[in-house]
């Protein structure tokens, strides 16, 4: 085992700087091979690392190889299996349990003892030893007396050092000189003892020989100690001197620190003073401008604006911590507050005076516009006030209460001014629409006329926008048609209270121009005022959602102050609402006046609602493109609702007039008045609504009207006593079809086809009904023939029927010679001419259809004769050519 241990040390552990302390020959439990060893090793370098190494003998030779190594610190438990009986088995618990069987119990105990010592020395008893004999562990524990014995192995472990080359050489020389030592160890030991004694004696003699030198050395040491004492005394004196200097330097350093601190404080104090002086010192010129600056001149306004900005900067300066506790700062702030209050009062008072003066100046120009349909220009007023825009912005940020008061006063003054201007403007528009003059209203010598005009004006003003549609729109249209149609219409419908001369195209064109001029004057006026309010009062006017007019109409002078009692500026959304509310207050009379004007236009002619709908829609669309939330857009939108309501009412009135129409029992019906009026309405509407934005409304109205026309044409046709129903339907639907074909109204294509179909159907029905009269007996005879055939009698056997034999056929045919047929056709032509009206010019169309139908019946009769009476030689006493000649001569003779 010693030779194996030496070989393992040399071949495996020495190259790795390790020492082999213990070895045990083992095999795994359950296996018979014993060619592996467990080795306990330590490293020669510090820190010492203790390992358990498994070494296996190579199968191909006698050399060993290192298979696996575990650090001893990873060993948790050493299980010897049995502490009493000898047992070569033991377990080592690393990351898993390794079961071993030693070659002998002695080797196992020696290995476990070595592990115990290494555990005691390097691992501080970390490893648990289970089933290990206490005697084995006690032998390994060092005690006082036997420490040198029991701890020998440990000391050997600690003091073992490998011989260097020189030591190995000396030992080899000594061994060569003492070869007999191998055979005679006692002689060799004795020789070594003698040499040791010789060396000890030499050492003693050397020590005794150096005694004198030692004494000399001691004296030198004593002298050196004395010198050291002297040096220490000098150093002590130097130290005392340095201590004094140190105290003086500390005083100087402290003094310098205080001086530096004082300088720093002075610099900071100067900086604070400069900050306060630079940011809270208002120039005397600014103070003078705020106290007594001229607010009427441009130069004075500029000086006051600069002074107000400087004051605002001084008041809004961000003070540093502690500044607000300084008395001077408090006094300066109070002075600034007094200046701000003083200038705010001066500015508010001056602007109030400007508002009043401008209102008086503007009122003086009203007389110049009283006879013209134009609104006074407020641009000079706005231009003068915009010079104060920056001051208004300053007032808004510094004293919101006075800013709010100015806003209220401006609305009060301007609302009264605009109310006078707008009412006079609308009064002129009404006069121009009605054709009267303002002077005649005021100075008319005829009391009846003056009373009538006054009553009409009062009724319009008293309506407050409440509209009443005309009940005679159909009559008004009929007046514009031809004389014959006008006379028919006047005989059917109530003409209302408006004269026919007021309803011509020129009057409608004049109304259209006046209404357009009214809107064109109002639009720039409102936009200019809204733009001025935004700029002058510094309010944002864009990106606002339009509010309801019902909420805005309740605005009074105190609304704004009630909304912001805190005196703080409005947020952006509230500013947008404020612009809208100010515009509503200033122009509160626009919507009622527009409604009154619309009511007048509707009273003059209900068809004026078409013009108003198109014009108002266009202006609303334009205003919404500029700013959907503007007052103008909202107001015109509300008025547009009224106009649309009037338009719908106009359509409803026309339908109601259709339903109420009454026809004369003594004269023929002809073209119904509402059919002719629909034609003129459609023509007028197409010219008005060309490329208009509200085309959809007209299309809906067309649909309602045409349905009403269709229904009431049938109603009148059913009630007609003088004119046959088919004639009424045929003529009127022909007229409707011609109208729709000419106007090419895309939304009424289906109705156009329906009208054509109704016209065609009733034309055919009328022709068939009328043609049954001239050849009545012949018709009855052949109807009987067809009835027999329908009952199942063969056609060639009909002639054997008593009532329908050849003699009866000849008898009936003889009753209708050519002369009688021509006479009957002539009577038929006269009757048709009596039924049809001249306007539609359908006589020839109907006559030609009758001719075709007569020829068709003739051919039908000829066919029945050929089939039912073959070989009889019976024929009609007139031919198709005779029929053509009869019809042509009759048409030419009339």
From Swiss-Prot:
GO molecular function: phosphatidylinositol-4,5-bisphosphate binding
Superkingdom of the source species: Eukaryota
GO BP annotation list: defense response to virus; exocytosis; Golgi to plasma membrane transport; membrane fission; mitotic cytokinesis; protein transport; regulation of macroautophagy; vesicle docking involved in exocytosis
SMART domains: Sec3-PIP2_bind
InterPro entries, per database record: Sec3-PIP2_bind, Sec3_C, Sec3_CC
Entry-annotated residues carrying Phosphoserine: 470, 473, 487, 501
Span list, region Disordered: 439-495
GO CC terms: cytoplasm; cytosol; exocyst; Flemming body; membrane; perinuclear region of cytoplasm; plasma membrane
Extent of Low complexity compositional bias: 460-491
Subunit structure: The exocyst complex is composed of EXOC1, EXOC2, EXOC3, EXOC4, EXOC5, EXOC6, EXOC7 and EXOC8. Interacts with EEF1A1. Interacts with SLC6A9; interaction increases the transporter capacity of SLC6A9 probably by promoting its insertion into the cell membrane.
UniProt similarity note: Belongs to the SEC3 family.
Protein name in the entry: Exocyst complex component 1
Species in which this protein is naturally found: Homo sapiens
